[in-house]
């Protein structure tokens, strides 16, 4: 099992990926403890001195002007969690819940939230024991933080709601008992600290980024395979072309194509002296289009990594000055915009792949049998597989509509502008699944096209990509039930079968 020492504010993208993919045993670095304790002491001083501070001894949202008596402060925090656990939709899977919890721990342990070390350790204990709160996927607008999802997470700490332990949904109290854990009672400020934050939005978008990286790499490999299958030129990947423009993403993608294609191959030599002057854009402009997508992936990584290590609570406790200051770090606009931009990249990766599939269907453009099968007419070959790819590409165009420009006021207009970051992040998963299906069809089609160049082979890496598929999916000599082959190729892509052929590009 993955073991990780968490130094607050220093999570790396690879650590976050590991948390998403695998259960983790988490330990808090000792350097965080003094800051955590100092912030709690500051909150206690405010309560003891009778000062009014939002979220500590007031109501919330539009009720912020309501002063709460000291004897009601614990009940205030518990009531906050219970009332805000109002999410709907399917439960998030264990991987997403685990990522949200680790992000929440990372933020709280920065020492600006006024939450006791014992509560943070209780969250860590949930992660380590594999107790995963039931968090519905929908119900947050991404400001004031991800209130509903994080309230559902926090319910389990209180022994309320449901949680999954060892694959079984149980009452939270039962799950805690089976894992050898106890519920906690929240003190002043702690319920708000748990609920306020962008951790669900950030986790949603991070999953989108992780999937987009796999899709990007797979699409580059399939684009190179298609280039060989239709006797495309290597000349558009010449480094001098891309250096002249100076777009770094484009330069790097062209380098990836040169790595995959190598200088030549038996296929390339077979048409070295052909009379074709230029390839269609879906081949020739791959570095330009995929380079723009890579730039978006890199920018998204920068924003999400900053947010993963951020303090997005409100109010914030500045213990060194003895102050609690209200602000707006809970507003997930950076995450929403990053997710929206990533959606454009995922849509374009799929759209370009679909155009290459269509190119292979056209015998005049590809110089291959119509629909990549012999005895056409009796056999329809890849005809409808390309239609499926077109349907998925079209869906993605609608899903790529930006969410960050869509705001609805909430909390009686106190919270009058929101980010919609959770929806922006969550839809990335559907887009990624669509794009993976498109790339799977291209992989099948490109390998079939190369097979039809009988006796000719591609570069070593591309032959490896073809062999990986052929170990699971046979060449098409005649029509057969097609859907299982797409499912098989899709599963291989999700396992990183093509991604591992591509050097690191992030």
Swiss-Prot record:
Q: Does the keyword Lyase apply?
A: yes
Quote the InterPro entries the UniProt record gives: Aromatic_Lyase (IPR001106), Fumarase/histidase_N (IPR024083), HutH (IPR005921), L-Aspartase-like (IPR008948), Phe/His_NH3-lyase_AS (IPR022313)
GO molecular function annotations of the record: histidine ammonia-lyase activity
GO cellular component: a single term? cytoplasm
Here the cross-link named 5-imidazolinone (Ala-Gly) sits at: 143-145
Which GO BP terms, alphabetically?
A: L-histidine catabolic process to glutamate and formamide; L-histidine catabolic process to glutamate and formate
Q: Which reaction does it catalyse?
A: L-histidine = trans-urocanate + NH4(+)
Q: Which PROSITE patterns match?
A: PAL_HISTIDASE
Which cysteine pairs make disulfide bonds? Answer: none
* Subcellular location as annotated: Cytoplasm
- Keyword field: Cytoplasm, Histidine metabolism, Lyase
Per the record, the pathway is: Amino-acid degradation; L-histidine degradation into L-glutamate; N-formimidoyl-L-glutamate from L-histidine: step 1/3
Q: How is it modified after translation?
A: Contains an active site 4-methylidene-imidazol-5-one (MIO), which is formed autocatalytically by cyclization and dehydration of residues Ala-Ser-Gly.
The EC number of this protein is: 4.3.1.3
The stretch of residues making up the signal peptide is none
| Modification sites for 2,3-didehydroalanine (Ser) | 144
Family label: Belongs to the PAL/histidase family.
Protein name, per record: Histidine ammonia-lyase
According to its UniProt entry, this protein's organism is: Salmonella gallinarum (strain 287/91 / NCTC 13346)
Query: Encoded by which gene?
Result: hutH
